[in-house]
A protein has these predicted regions:
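Glycine/Thr-rich phosphate-binding loops of Rossmann-like dinucleotide-binding domains
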Residues: 27-29, 65, 70, 151-154, ...
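Glycine-rich dinucleotide-binding loop and its adjacent helix/turn
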Residues: 21-75, 80, 105-109, 158-160, ...
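A Rossmann-like FAD-binding core segment of flavoenzymes
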Residues: 1, 73-174, 237, 244, ...
Length: 314
């Protein structure tokens, strides 16, 4: 492999290689990216002062996580999302406790609305809205969080014979091996879900495969977590996926309003649910909404992985 460095170029030989080049924030076109008041998620972590008002474009996990942070720090937060619901990909009932809570705390949440353009003014950025919410509003800062794009097409992987899709992803098998037998890929560059803990496990699988171990990766047992307030987490098959595949499934729910600890913490808005296959009674998925859902979902991952029967859980 050839490496271009500041001082010189260097060639490195290897028996096996792992590509872990990640992804970058997706930038909307026709936006004034030269203005530092327009940010991506990386910029939002480097602010030296808290903005009085913040517009978050994108109601996905990253956008909502940053919205929760800055709302807690005192910003008047507005979220705009193009689709009919927040956090696409999660089951709507899991998102509902979060949406009810932030609706009381944020300045506004605009669904089925898009930002058509952003004008630069001396004292603010002016966002123009189209859709269910029309008009224009001023904000001290605007965060664009509409997704991420993989970096697979930025490293000349094709020169080594590695397949890269038109979207920049690098396809792999369940050992994280690319179409070139001694080159592996992990993390955001191999596809969804784009989660750090997924990438860590993929790295373990790839390293074991390099060492000749019989290791394999199954994305279905990797939990997805939104570190919002309340947190939202799920693992395995979602209800939307079960419906789409025509699976005959059942749902068991436990409302946290019936939990003494939740009552003591005055956080009863959450719930836990399990999905099971009605034919086999085996658990195929789980979801949790509420404080510390990201920790609690770890209890559900082995249940989903081992396909315990519904009556075997308590």
């Amino acid at each position: 492999i050839g490496v271009e460095r500041r001082e010189d170029n260097k060639r490195i030989t290897f028996e096996n290689a792992i590509i872990a080049v990640g992804s970058q924030s997706l930038e909307l076109s026709n936006m004034p990216w030269g203005d530092p008041r327009l940010m991506d998620s990386t910029d939002a972590l480097e602010l030296e002062e808290i903005p009085g008002s913040l517009l978050v474009i994108g109601g996905g996990i990253i956008g909502l996580e940053m919205a929760c942070v800055y709302s807690a720090l005192g910003s008047a937060v507005t979220v705009v999302e193009l689709t009919p619901g927040l956090m696409p990909g999660a089951d709507p009932d899991l998102v509902r406790p979060l949406q009810r809570r932030i609706a009381k705390r944020y300045a506004a949440i605009h669904l089925e609305t898009k930002v058509t353009r952003i004008d630069v003014a001396d004292d603010a950025l002016v966002a123009h809205f189209e859709g269910k919410h029309e008009g224009q509003e001023k904000f001290e800062r605007i965060l664009v969080a509409v997704g991420r794009t993989p970096n697979g097409d930025r490293i000349h992987a094709k020169a080594a014979g590695v397949e890269v899709t038109s979207r920049g992803f690098i396809p792999t098998d369940n050992q994280m091996r690319t179409n070139v037998p001694n080159i592996f890929a992990i993390g955001d560059v191999v596809g969804q879900p784009m989660l750090a803990h997924k990438a860590t496990h993929e790295g373990k699988v790839a390293a074991e495969a390099c060492a000749g171990e019989k290791s394999a990766f199954d994305a279905r047992v990797i939990p997805s977590v939104a570190y919002t307030d309340p947190e939202v987490a799920w693992v395995g098959v979602t209800e939307a996926e079960a419906k789409e595949s025509g699976l005959d499934y059942g749902v068991g729910k436990f409302p946290w309003a019936a939990s003494g600890r939740a009552l003591g913490n005055d956080r009863t808005e959450g719930f836990t649910k399990l999905l099971f296959d009605k034919k086999t009674n085996r658990i195929i998925g789980a979801g949790i909404a509420g404080p510390h859902a990201g920790d609690l979902i770890a209890e559900c991952a082995p249940v989903s992985y081992t396909h315990l029967r519904a009556h075997e859980t308590t």
